[in-house]
Amino acid sequence: MFRNPDINRLAVHAGLRQLAWGLAGIFFFAVLLRAGLSPAGAFLALGAMLGLRLVTRPAAFALIRGAGLRTAMLVGCVLFAGQFPVLALVDAGRPWTIAAYVLAVAIADVVYWTCYHAVFAAAGDVGERGAQIGVRTVVMVLADTVAPVVGGLLLTWHGWAAFAAATVVALIAIVPFRGVSVPDVVIAEDHGPAPFRDGVRLFATDGFLMCGFAVTWGLIMFETFDRRFDAFGGLLGAAALAGAVGGLVLGRLIDAGHAARAVWLNLAAMTAVVLLRVALADTPTGVVVAALASTALFGLYVPTLMTAVYNAAKTSPCAVRFHYRAEAGWDVGGIAACLATAAALAAGVPARLLLLAALPALVVQAILLHRRYLAATPDAPTGAALAGRID
């Protein structure tokens, strides 16, 4: 894959983690609905999860400082695996089970994702970042094409088996990570918020989009197919396959020096995704067409965003602090999306119209990305943009 063995190991780890997520975790919102929560109630539960992540973040940072990045990452991996048995227990008739799931996911996420992003940012290579993220995305997409199909069938026939399989695979994902040479990261000094501002703003837009637009689309798909796990999982798998090519193509485009151009290409693609999903969300056939066609375009999104984020983290004074603060921004954006979506659904606004809220967020994100990519090439000659080296 790459000359960098640590990136290869992290890609395998990410693939196994995504396989575990696809077997059970990807269905979390659907499980909450089947457990008896209303759509608005499920969004409030997700918002509570993000709120808890936000307030427990200092404790996670203390763990990283005290135990080190490698140990904290291993703890995060175990906690990530532990969320699936708790999800199996959720029942709206027993509110404590939902509270337990919210707590389990919040603690797992706040430790795992801060560590994972910091490790990937520090271990990766700036000159190959886009391609490395693109390949990682393809590895994860391969997992996403299989796991939701299998997970949907298991949840339909023997629900406990899906959660057990996800737990085992998540624990196996620890094995490739143990071979990664985790870079030393100095986190004792507080550098203030300024060096990390780009990450916070970019992740806030991503949190808003993922918790609003992406989850709402999942709700539409699940409801369209009468809340059947098997049909929902099959559609998720087929849609994931359609998104693989975009990630690879755009990752190479970024590495070739066309990052700024890729930003606007991604904005156009994501705008088309939003409009396509809104237009076709009324019928099962339309939902299938929109899911397959739009996910192919959605494959451009992750490399465009995360190349900028990881490169900013690597050049920041501290990659751990960068992602600690950036993840907090993600939580704030996600909470805003969850509260707004829950209120709109409770007021009777059709879910398909709520997808349009993604459009202004995408514009803001594109502006931030464009500024970030241009700022990352301060020594480029005046004519570089016309020559195609930074645009």
Annotate each predicted stretch with a short phrase.
Residues T56-L69, L155, V245-A259:
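Helix-to-loop junctions at the C-terminal end of transmembrane segments
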Residues M1-G51, A194-G237:
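Helix-loop boundary and gating motifs at the non-cytosolic
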